[in-house]
C-alpha cells in the first residue's frame, strides 16, 4: 500500500510554525481580544448583547460610543452620525438570530472511541502490516532496540494527517459543508452593513416591508447554514473517531511486531501510557480540534478577505501587527511542543510505577511497602505537576500578552476607522461591516489559537508515537521459508552457537554451544541454575538470534524460516504458565490457529487428556470460569494442566517443556506428570528436567555448564562418571526422586 497523496490533505493542513507571516499566528491577537473584558471600544457591546439582551447592550453601546466620540479629534460631522449608526447596529446585532454564532465557543463533545480489533485479520494487515509509507528506515546495525526519535522525513503534522487518508471522502464532504456554512455565516455582516446604510441614509422612507422580506430571506439562509454546520460536525466527528481507532490499532500492531529484545529494554508501563494517554492526546488534536480548527480557519480567511474588500487601507493597518505577534506564537508553540513531550515522558514513568506495583500487589503487601510505594508514586506525580505549572505559566504569559495586543488593535481600528469616516473614505455601514467582520475574525482566530495550542501538544505526543509506529523490528515478523508439511520431521541441531542477551551484551551465555536432538526423541537438559537452560528454549522459538553459529530445523537454518510458521510447530509449557484474564475455555482455545473455530468438544477432549476436566467441572461455571489476571484464581497444578491442554490443542511437532512439578503437592504432581507423558508421546521433545523419572525415560541427557554441553549420553552412562558434573548434581540431590 502506497502513501496517501497530498492533494486531499492540503485542505486540512495547518500553517507551518516556521512561516510566521502566514495566518495562523494572528490567532494570538484576536483570541485575546475576544476573551479579555474591559475594552472601552463601542463594539465590545457585541458580547454583552448576547448575554444580557438588546436593551442593556444598546444603552451600553450608545454610552461607550459617546465616550469614544468625545475623545475623537478631527472626526468632523461624520463622526457624530457614525456613532449613532453604530449604536443602531448594536441593537440590530443584539436582536439577530442566535444561529449566527452557532458553535463559536462550545466545541463538540469528546467522542467515544470504538473498541479496536485485534490486529490479526486481513483488514488489519491491509493497513498495519504492509504500509511501507508509514514506516521509517531500518534501524542501523548499532541500534540497541531502545525507543529513539523518529527519523527525519515528512513533517509530523503531515504524518498525523496521513492517518486521515482513508477518510478522505467523508472529510472532503465535511469540508464542502464547512465552506457552505462559513460562507453563509460570513455573508451576514456584509448585508447587515448594507441594511444599516439604507436605514441611515433614508430614515423617512417606509422600509418595513422590504426589511421584513430581507430578514425572512436571511433567516432561511441561516437555517441552511445551520444544517450544513450540523452535517459538518457529524462527518468530522465520526471520521475522527475512525482515525483514532486506526491509530490505536496500528500502534498496538506495531508494538506486538517488535522483537522480544525490545521489550527487555522498554518498560511495559511506558508502552501502555503511549497506547492510552498519548493516543488520547493526539486523538483530541485530530477529532475535536480538527473540526473546530477548520471552521475557524475558513471563517477567519473569509473574514479577512471581506475586511480587505470593505476597506483595504484599514485592513492593511490592522494586519501590520501580525509579524511580531507571529514570532511570539511560534516561540510559544515550539516551547509547548517540547514541554508536552517531556510531560508525557514523566507521566509514562508514573504509569510504569503504578502498573508494576499494582500487578505485584501481593509482593508489596507481603513486605509491608504500601506507604513506600505511595510516596514513590506521589513523587512521580509531583514532577508531572511541576511541568504542568510551567505550561500554565507559559500559557498565562502568552494569552496575557496577546490579549493586550488585541485590545490595542481594537482601539486602533476604532481610531483609524473614525478618521476614515471623517474624511469620507468610509460610510457608517462599511465601518459597521468592518467591525462585525473584525469581531467574527476575532472569534474565529481565537478558535485557531486554541487549535494551534492543542495541535502543538498533540504533535508533542505524536513524536513519541511515531517512534513506535516507524520502528522496524530487528527480527522478521512473518517472512521466510515454510517447509513442506509432508516431509517435516522436527529434527533440531545447535552448531557452534554464541549468544548474549541484547540487554546484557557483555555477559555471554553460550560459547561454542552445540547440541543435536533427533526427530521424535526426548532429550533432557540438565545443569546448575543460571547455566542457560531456559535460553535454549528461547533460541529455538527464535525470540532471539544467536551472535554466531546456526540453529537448524531439519537441516534448515531457522533464520531462513518463517517465524510464525516455526512457532506454530512448537508447543511450550513453562515453569509458571501465563493465562489470560478470560474463561478456561478461551485459554485452552488460545493454542489453536483459529481460536474462534474451536468447538466445545475439542476443548473438553484435550482437557480430559490433560487431567483438567475433574477440577473444571467442580467450578460453578465450568469451562466458562474466568481465571483472573495471569490465572491468579487457580492453583499452580490447575494452571499447569490448562497449559498442557492448550499445548495439546495446538498439536505441535516439537515440544519445549520446562518441568515445574517440584512446587506441587503429591496428587497434583502425579496428575500433571501423567498429562505431560501423554503430551510428549510421538513428538520431538526438549525438556528442562527436574524429575529423576523424566531423566531416566529420556533418550538422551545433555548436561549444560558455563555455556557449553559438557556431558551427553544416557542416564546410566553419565552416572558412571565419578567426577562428572551430572554425578555431582545427583549427589547433591538436585533432582526429585519420584
UniProtKB/Swiss-Prot annotation:
Swiss-Prot/TrEMBL catalytic activity? biliverdin IXalpha(in) + ATP + H2O = biliverdin IXalpha(out) + ADP + phosphate + H(+)
Give the UniProt keywords, A-Z: Acetylation, ATP-binding, Glutathionylation, Magnesium, Membrane, Metal-binding, Mitochondrion, Mitochondrion inner membrane, Nucleotide-binding, Transit peptide, Translocase, Transmembrane, Transmembrane helix, Transport
What EC designation does it have?
A: 7.6.2.-
Protein's membrane topology: Multi-pass membrane protein
Q: Name one GO biological process term.
A: positive regulation of heme biosynthetic process
The activity regulation comment is: Cholesterol promotes the ATPase activity of ABCB10 in a dose-dependent manner.
UniProt entry tagged with the keyword Metal-binding = yes
Please state what the protein is called: ATP-binding cassette sub-family B member 10, mitochondrial
Q: Which gene encodes it?
A: ABCB10
Q: Which GO terms describe its cellular component?
A: mitochondrial inner membrane; mitochondrial membrane; mitochondrion
Residue spans, topological domain Mitochondrial matrix: 106-168, 237-287, 334-392, 453-738
The residue spans the entry assigns to the Mitochondrial intermembrane side of the membrane are as follows 193-213, 311-313, 417-430
Q: What is the lineage of its organism?
A: Eukaryota, Metazoa, Chordata, Craniata, Vertebrata
Amino acid at each position: 500500500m502506497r502513501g496517501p497523496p497530498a492533494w486531499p490533505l492540503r485542505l486540512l493542513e495547518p500553517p507551518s510554525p516556521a512561516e510566521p507571516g502566514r495566518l495562523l499566528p494572528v490567532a494570538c491577537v484576536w483570541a485575546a481580544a475576544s476573551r479579555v473584558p474591559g475594552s472601552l471600544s463601542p463594539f465590545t457591546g457585541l458580547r454583552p448583547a448576547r448575554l444580557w439582551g438588546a436593551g442593556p447592550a444598546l444603552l451600553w453601546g450608545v454610552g461607550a460610543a459617546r465616550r469614544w466620540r468625545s475623545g475623537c479629534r478631527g472626526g468632523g460631522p461624520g463622526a457624530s452620525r457614525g456613532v449613532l449608526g453604530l449604536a443602531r447596529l448594536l441593537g440590530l446585532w443584539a436582536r439577530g438570530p442566535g444561529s449566527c454564532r452557532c458553535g463559536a465557543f462550545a466545541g463538540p463533545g469528546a467522542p467515544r472511541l470504538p473498541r479496536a480489533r485485534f490486529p490479526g485479520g486481513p483488514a488489519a494487515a491491509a493497513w498495519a502490516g504492509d504500509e511501507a509509507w508509514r514506516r521509517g528506515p531500518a534501524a542501523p546495525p548499532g541500534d540497541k532496540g531502545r525507543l529513539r526519535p523518529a527519523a527525519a522525513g515528512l513533517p509530523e503534522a503531515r504524518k498525523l494527517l496521513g492517518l486521515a487518508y482513508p477518510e478522505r471522502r467523508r472529510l472532503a464532504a465535511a469540508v464542502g459543508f464547512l465552506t457552505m456554512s462559513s460562507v453563509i455565516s460570513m455573508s451576514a455582516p456584509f448585508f447587515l452593513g448594507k441594511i444599516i446604510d439604507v436605514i441611515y441614509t433614508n430614515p423617512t422612507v417606509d422600509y418595513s416591508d422590504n426589511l421584513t422580506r430581507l430578514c425572512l430571506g436571511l433567516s432561511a439562509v441561516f437555517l441552511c447554514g445551520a444544517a450544513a454546520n450540523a452535517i459538518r460536525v457529524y462527518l468530522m466527528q465520526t471520521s475522527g473517531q475512525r482515525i483514532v481507532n486506526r491509530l490505536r490499532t496500528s500502534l498496538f500492531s506495531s508494538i506486538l511486531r517488535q522483537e522480544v529484545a525490545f521489550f527487555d529494554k522498554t518498560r511495559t508501563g511506558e508502552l501502555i501510557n503511549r497506547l492510552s494517554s498519548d493516543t488520547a492526546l493526539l486523538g483530541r488534536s485530530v477529532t475535536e480540534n480538527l473540526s473546530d480548527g477548520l471552521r475557524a480557519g475558513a471563517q477567519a480567511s473569509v473574514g479577512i478577505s471581506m475586511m480587505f474588500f470593505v476597506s483595504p487601507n484599514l485592513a492593511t493597518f490592522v494586519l501590520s501587527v501580525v509579524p511580531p505577534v507571529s514570532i511570539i506564537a511560534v516561540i510559544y508553540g515550539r516551547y509547548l511542543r517540547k514541554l508536552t513531550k517531556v510531560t508525557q515522558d514523566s507521566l509514562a514513568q508514573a504509569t510504569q510505577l503504578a502498573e508494576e506495583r499494582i500487578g505485584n500487589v501481593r509482593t508489596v503487601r507481603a513486605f509491608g511497602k504500601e506507604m513506600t510505594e505511595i510516596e514513590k508514586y506521589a513523587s512521580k506525580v509531583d514532577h508531572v505537576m511541576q511541568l504542568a505549572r510551567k505550561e500554565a505559566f507559559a500559557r498565562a504569559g502568552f494569552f496575557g500578552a496577546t490579549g493586550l495586543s488585541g485590545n490595542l488593535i481594537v482601539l486602533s481600528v476604532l481610531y483609524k476607522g473614525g478618521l476614515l469616516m471623517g474624511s469620507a473614505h468610509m460610510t457608517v455601514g462599511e465601518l459597521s461591516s468592518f467591525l462585525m467582520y473584525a469581531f467574527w475574525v476575532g472569534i474565529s482566530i481565537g478558535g485557531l489559537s486554541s487549535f494551534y495550542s492543542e495541535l502543538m501538544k498533540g504533535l508533542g505526543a505524536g513524536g513519541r508515537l511515531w517512534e513506535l509506529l516507524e520502528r522496524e523490528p530487528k527480527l522478521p515478523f512473518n517472512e521466510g521459508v515454510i517447509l513442506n508439511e509432508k516431509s517435516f520431521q522436527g529434527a533440531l541441531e545447535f552448531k557452534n552457537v554464541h549468544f548474549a542477551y541484547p540487554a546484557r551484551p557483555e555477559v555471554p551465555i553460550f560459547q561454542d554451544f552445540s547440541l543435536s536432538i533427533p526427530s521424535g526423541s526426548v532429550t533432557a537438559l540438565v545443569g546448575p541454575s543460571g547455566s542457560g537452560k531456559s535460553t535454549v528454549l528461547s533460541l529455538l522459538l527464535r525470540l532471539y538470534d544467536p551472535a554466531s553459529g546456526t540453529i537448524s530445523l531439519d537441516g534448515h537454518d531457522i533464520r531462513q524460516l518463517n517465524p510464525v510458521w516455526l512457532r506454530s510447530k512448537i508447543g511450550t509449557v513453562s515453569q509458571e504458565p501465563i493465562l489470560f484474564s478470560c474463561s478456561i475455555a478461551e485459554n485452552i482455545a488460545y493454542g489453536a490457529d483459529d481460536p474462534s473455530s474451536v468447538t466445545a468438544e475439542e476443548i473438553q477432549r484435550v482437557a480430559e487428556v490433560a487431567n483438567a476436566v475433574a477440577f473444571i467441572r467442580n467450578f460453578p461455571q465450568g469451562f466458562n470460569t474466568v481465571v483472573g489476571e495471569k490465572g491468579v484464581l487457580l492453583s499452580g497444578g490447575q494452571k499447569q494442566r490448562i497449559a498442557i491442554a492448550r499445548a495439546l490443542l495446538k498439536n505441535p511437532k516439537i515440544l519445549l517443556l520446562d518441568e515445574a512439578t517440584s512446587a506441587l503437592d503429591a496428587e497434583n504432581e502425579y496428575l500433571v506428570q501423567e498429562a505431560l507423558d501423554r503430551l510428549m508421546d510421538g513428538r520431538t521433545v526438549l525438556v528442562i528436567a527436574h524429575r529423576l523419572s523424566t531423566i531416566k525415560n529420556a533418550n538422551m541427557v545433555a548436561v549444560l555448564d558455563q555455556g557449553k554441553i559438557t556431558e551427553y549420553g544416557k542416564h546410566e552412562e553419565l552416572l558412571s562418571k565419578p567426577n562428572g558434573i551430572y554425578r555431582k548434581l545427583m549427589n547433591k540431590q538436585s533432582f526429585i526422586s519420584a
